[in-house]
Amino acid sequence: GALCAMRRWPLPSVAEVCKSARRVAVMENIVDHTNVGALMRSAAALDVDAVLVTPSCGDPLYRRAARVSMGTVFQIPWTRITGFNDDGTENKHYWPFQGIDELKSLGFTTVAMALEDRSISLDELTRRLHAPAEDPTHIDKLALIFGTEGDGLSHHTIARADLTVKIPMSHGVDSLNVAASSAVAFYATR
């Protein structure tokens, strides 16, 4: 039988969620609800102001995601990044094309978390965050973008982001799970 029925509230716009945010996380097409929930929990615990999810990302309100998040999905502001065509239909190509531009227009430096040759280290990103405002490399508002399990971020996202950042690895390990890497990045950029 049914335990309860609930009405889902309408999601706010990206601009509303990011209005007073200084640090946001973006989940690009993360489909494993365990990872969605873990990222939400880490974001809440490590002072991320908001979480944005792309249209193909798993639902943070899905039962497994909500359980893994330990309920923090109901505490941290979040919304889906969506855009609409002139006729009112959803624009399936809004992310990453106009979506990244929207974040930039809101004053965010967009950071693709990816293992690329041109990536800077997480330590360098942290230095830029804490640099004096007059330093030309200073970052004021930060949008950390995390990619799906296996494939990572799309090449379109990496190409459009302001910076690409990697977490240095040891012992021949090539990468971390998205939930682990997000926690490391959230902690380092506090």
Residues of each region from the PLM?
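Structured adenosyl-cofactor binding patch, chiefly the S-adenosyl-L-methionine
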Residues: 2-4, 42-46, 57-74, 155-190
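RNA substrate-binding interface of SAM-dependent RNA methyltransferases
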Residues: 6-118
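Secondary-structure junction/capping motif
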Residues: 12-13, 121-123, 177
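Generic low-complexity, intrinsically disordered sequence content enriched
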Residues: 101, 107, 126-129, 133, ...
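Active-site/ligand-binding-proximal alpha/beta "capping" segment
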Residues: 111-173
